[in-house]
């Protein structure tokens, strides 16, 4: 849904007649994909076969959620994901959108007028989620590690029982869409 990569991989696999190869559309990005890959590796180490791993990843991918606060919509506009009108209005009003990516769909959750307040709201939203305790929470950032460190501190303060909170810098492709000063959280719901 987010990109055509999974569809392209499936077409290629069908063309060459792959056997025991499963193409999975993760319906997520960045650290959300990291959660899936690490889980697949864990399942393999437990002795699961490719079919069992595929079935479990298909099940768990629907429970992955990604929350993020963006400093600007400029980069989403440049990448064709947001209209020029929306990007311009957000810039003029100094709106910092708080979004959720879940099941391949992007949803606007809130609008903040301050990037630090928007990022702090991510931890507050996470506090209201039913987290799967068997998975870590990943804090992602595009360019400003201090914002990620602040968010990590907020999560640890609000959710002291979270099994693991780790910081991850987003890659160049995601970074080119979300811009600088963006920060987010990837997690698995119950």
Q: What is each model feature region?
A:
Residues 2-22, 28-190:
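Mixed-charge interfacial surface used for oligomerization/domain docking
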């Amino acid at each position: 849904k987010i990109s055509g990569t999974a569809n392209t991989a499936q077409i290629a696999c069908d063309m060459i007649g792959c056997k025991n190869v499963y193409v999975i559309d993760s319906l997520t990005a960045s650290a959300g994909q990291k959660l899936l890959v690490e889980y697949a590796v864990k399942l393999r180490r437990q002795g699961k076969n490719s079919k069992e791993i595929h079935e479990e990843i298909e099940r768990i991918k629907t429970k992955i959620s990604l929350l993020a606060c963006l400093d600007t919509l400029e980069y989403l506009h440049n990448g064709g994901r947001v209209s020029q009108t929306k990007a311009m209005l957000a810039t003029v009003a100094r709106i910092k959108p708080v979004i959720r990516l879940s099941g391949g769909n992007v949803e606007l959750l809130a609008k903040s007028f301050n990037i630090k307040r928007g990022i702090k709201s991510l931890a507050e939203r996470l506090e209201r989620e039913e987290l799967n305790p068997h998975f870590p929470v990943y804090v992602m950032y595009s360019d400003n590690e201090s914002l990620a460190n602040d968010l990590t501190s907020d999560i640890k303060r609000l959710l002291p029982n979270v099994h693991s909170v780790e910081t991850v810098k987003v890659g160049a492709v995601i970074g080119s869409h979300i811009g600088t000063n963006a920060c987010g959280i990837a997690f698995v719901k119950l």
